[in-house]
C-alpha cells in the first residue's frame, strides 16, 4: 500500500530546515498547543485556513467553517419499485392517492339514473373504498410485472407461487404471521399455478416438486386485498407460440365481458357475447386444429368485502339468467377457454379451502378441529387459504382436523378443476367496479 498523508503532517509548519520541531509536551509548556477539538477533523465540519492581514510567520491563522452537508439516509423515500418487489407501496405513493384503473363509459344511456353532479358526489363519498381497491390493484400490477418477466421453464411451481405471495405481503406491509394481520391486508387467496388441462384451484402443497416446462400452458391466478377489498386478476403464460391463438381468444373474450358489463346489464346476455367471441377463434396445436371452447361450468362472480364469491355468477356461455348487475357492485370478469371438452370436474389433491360465511355451530369431537378453526378465524376469516399458509403459521398435524371441518360444513374445500387430460386451457380475468358515472377496470394494466 502507498503511504497516506495524514492531517497531522499537513498542519505541521517547518520554519527552517535546520530548526528543531517542538514536541507536543514542549508546545504545551510554551503555550503553542492547539485545542484538541481543532486539531482533529470532524465528519461534519471541514476547516480551511485563511490568511489574515496581520498574520505573520508565527501568527495564528483564522479559520472558516464549511457548512454541514446533509447526510442522505439509505433507502429514504424510494421512487421506484425494487426487483423483486419489496418496497411498501404506500412509500411510493405517500399522498395515499393510487392510480385510477381504466375508466369506461357505460354504453346504455338508460344506465344513468342520476345527474352528473350527483354521480360525482357519490364517487367522492366512495373515495376510501376506491383507494383501497386501487392500492390493491397497483400492487397486483407491480407484482405480476415482475412475475411475468421472471417466470421461466425449470422453476418449481412452489417457487413461483411463493415468490408472488412474498411480493404481495411485502408491498401491502402485511407479512401475515401475526394473529389477524392477514385479515387487514395481503394475500387474498392461494396463488393458482394451473398447468395445461388444470383450469383452476391448483396451488402446490408442501413437498410438491412439479417443475414448469417450456411446453406447458400455465394460468397464474392471484389476489391482493386491502381491508377485505379483493382484487382478483389472472393471466396465462405460454412459452411456445403455437398456443398464441388460445391465449388471444380468452383474452378477447374477457375484454368482451368487460365491454358488456354495466349497471342493469343482464348476466345471461353477457355470457352470450363472451361465448361468441371465444368460439370465433381456432388454434392449431401439434398439427391438429381446435375450436376454442368456453368452459361452460366456470364463471365470473361478484366480490364482497372479505368474500371472494359474493353470490352472483357471470356465465361465459349463453344462459337465461336475467339477474342484473347493480350500481356499486364489484365483479371479477373471468373467462376460460379449452381445447378439450369445455367442461371441468374435481380432481387431484386439494389445496384450497375457505371458511363458510354462515357456517353451522356444531360440536367438534376432534380436538384438533376446534384448535384449527380458531386459527382460521383469527388469520383468514372468510378469505380462502391453503395448506402452505397453515404450515407457515406453524400448524402441523392438522389434516384430520381440517377434514373434520370440511365434513361438518364449516370449511369448504375447493379441489383443482380439470378438463380432459391432454387438453390445454387458458384464463384471463379482471376486477371491475360499477361506479355511478362509469365502470372502472381496477386491475387493468399495460400487459392485459
Swiss-Prot record:
- The protein's enzyme class: hydrolase
Q: Where is this region: Disordered?
A: 1-94
The UniProt regions of compositional bias labelled Basic residues, in chain numbering, are 61-74
Q: Recall the GO molecular function terms of this protein's record.
A: initiator methionyl aminopeptidase activity; metal ion binding; metalloaminopeptidase activity
Spans through the membrane: none
Its BP terms in the Gene Ontology are: proteolysis
Quote the cofactor binding remark: Binds 2 divalent metal cations per subunit. Has a high-affinity and a low affinity metal-binding site. The true nature of the physiological cofactor is under debate. The enzyme is active with cobalt, zinc, manganese or divalent iron ions. Most likely, methionine aminopeptidases function as mononuclear Fe(2+)-metalloproteases under physiological conditions, and the catalytically relevant metal-binding site has been assigned to the histidine-containing high-affinity site.
- Which reaction is this enzyme known to catalyze? Release of N-terminal amino acids, preferentially methionine, from peptides and arylamides
Give the matching CDD domains.
MetAP2
The record, for InterPro entries, names: Creatinase/aminopeptidase-like (IPR036005), Met_Aminopeptidase_Type2 (IPR050247), Pept_M24 (IPR000994), Pept_M24_MAP (IPR001714), Pept_M24A_MAP2 (IPR002468), WH-like_DNA-bd_sf (IPR036388), WH_DNA-bd_sf (IPR036390)
- Keywords assigned by UniProt? Aminopeptidase, Cytoplasm, Hydrolase, Metal-binding, Protease
Q: Does the keyword Protease apply?
A: yes
Q: Which residues bind a divalent metal cation 1?
A: 221, 232, 429
Q: What cofactor does this chain's UniProt record say it requires?
A: Co(2+); Zn(2+); Mn(2+); Fe(2+)
Q: Which GO terms describe its cellular component?
A: cytoplasm
Q: What domain of life does the UniProt record list for this protein's source?
A: Eukaryota
Similarity-based family:
Belongs to the peptidase M24A family. Methionine aminopeptidase eukaryotic type 2 subfamily.
**What does this protein's UniProt record list under function?**
Cotranslationally removes the N-terminal methionine from nascent proteins. The N-terminal methionine is often cleaved when the second residue in the primary sequence is small and uncharged (Met-Ala-, Cys, Gly, Pro, Ser, Thr, or Val).
Fetch the HAMAP family from UniProt. Answer: MetAP_2_euk (MF_03175)
Q: What is this protein called?
A: Methionine aminopeptidase 2
| Organism expressing this protein natively | Botryotinia fuckeliana (strain B05.10)
Q: What is the lineage of its organism?
A: Eukaryota, Fungi, Dikarya, Ascomycota, Pezizomycotina
Amino acid at each position: 500500500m502507498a503511504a497516506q498523508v495524514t492531517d497531522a503532517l499537513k498542519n505541521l509548519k517547518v520554519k527552517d530546515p535546520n530548526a528543531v520541531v517542538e514536541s507536543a509536551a514542549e508546545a504545551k509548556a510554551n503555550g503553542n498547543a492547539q485545542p484538541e477539538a481543532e486539531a482533529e477533523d470532524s465528519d461534519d465540519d471541514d476547516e480551511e485556513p485563511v490568511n489574515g492581514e496581520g498574520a505573520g510567520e508565527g501568527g495564528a491563522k483564522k479559520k472558516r467553517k464549511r457548512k454541514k452537508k446533509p447526510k442522505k439516509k439509505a433507502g429514504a423515500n424510494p421512487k421506484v419499485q425494487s426487483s423483486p418487489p419489496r418496497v411498501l407501496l404506500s412509500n411510493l405513493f405517500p399522498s395515499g392517492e393510487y392510480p385510477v384503473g381504466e375508466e369506461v363509459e357505460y354504453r346504455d344511456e338508460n344506465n344513468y339514473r342520476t345527474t352528473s353532479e350527483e354521480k360525482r358526489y357519490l364517487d367522492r363519498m366512495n373515495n376510501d373504498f376506491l383507494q383501497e381497491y386501487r392500492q390493491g390493484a397497483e400492487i397486483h400490477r407491480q407484482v405480476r410485472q415482475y412475475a411475468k418477466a421472471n417466470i421461466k421453464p425449470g422453476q418449481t411451481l412452489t417457487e413461483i407461487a411463493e415468490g408472488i405471495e412474498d411480493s404481495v405481503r411485502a408491498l401491502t406491509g402485511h407479512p401475515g404471521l401475526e394473529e389477524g394481520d392477514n385479515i387487514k391486508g395481503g394475500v387474498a387467496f392461494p396463488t393458482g399455478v394451473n398447468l395445461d388441462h388444470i383450469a383452476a384451484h391448483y396451488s402446490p402443497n408442501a413437498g410438491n416438486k412439479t417443475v414448469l416446462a417450456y411446453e406447458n400452458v400455465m394460468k397464474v391466478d392471484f389476489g391482493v386485498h386491502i381491508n377485505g377489498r379483493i382484487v382478483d386478476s389472472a393471466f396465462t403464460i405460454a412459452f411456445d407460440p403455437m398456443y398464441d391463438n388460445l391465449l388471444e381468444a380468452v383474452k378477447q373474450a374477457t375484454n368482451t365481458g368487460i365491454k358488456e358489463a354495466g349497471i342493469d346489464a343482464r348476466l345471461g346476455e353477457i355470457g352470450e357475447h363472451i361465448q361468441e367471441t371465444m368460439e370465433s377463434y381456432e388454434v392449431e396445436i401439434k398439427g391438429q386444429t381446435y375450436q376454442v371452447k368456453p368452459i361452460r361450468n366456470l364463471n365470473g362472480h361478484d366480490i364482497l368485502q372479505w368474500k371472494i364469491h359474493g353470490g352472483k355468477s357471470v356465465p361465459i356461455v349463453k344462459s337465461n339468467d336475467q339477474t342484473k348487475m347493480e350500481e356499486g357492485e364489484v365483479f371479477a370478469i373471468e373467462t376460460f377457454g379449452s381445447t378439450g371438452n369445455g367442461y371441468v370436474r374435481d380432481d387431484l389433491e386439494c389445496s384450497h379451502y375457505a371458511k363458510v360465511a354462515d357456517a353451522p355451530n356444531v360440536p367438534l369431537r376432534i380436538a384438533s378441529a376446534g384448535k384449527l378453526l380458531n386459527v382460521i378465524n383469527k388469520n383468514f376469516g372468510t378469505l380462502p387459504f391453503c395448506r402452505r399458509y397453515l404450515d407457515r403459521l406453524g400448524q402441523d398435524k392438522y389434516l384430520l382436523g381440517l377434514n373434520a371441518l370440511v365434513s361438518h360444513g364449516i370449511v369448504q374445500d375447493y379441489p383443482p378443476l380439470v378438463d380432459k387430460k391432454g387438453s390445454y386451457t387458458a384464463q384471463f380475468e379482471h376486477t371491475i367496479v360499477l361506479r355511478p358515472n362509469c365502470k372502472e377496470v381496477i386491475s387493468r394494466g399495460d400487459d392485459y
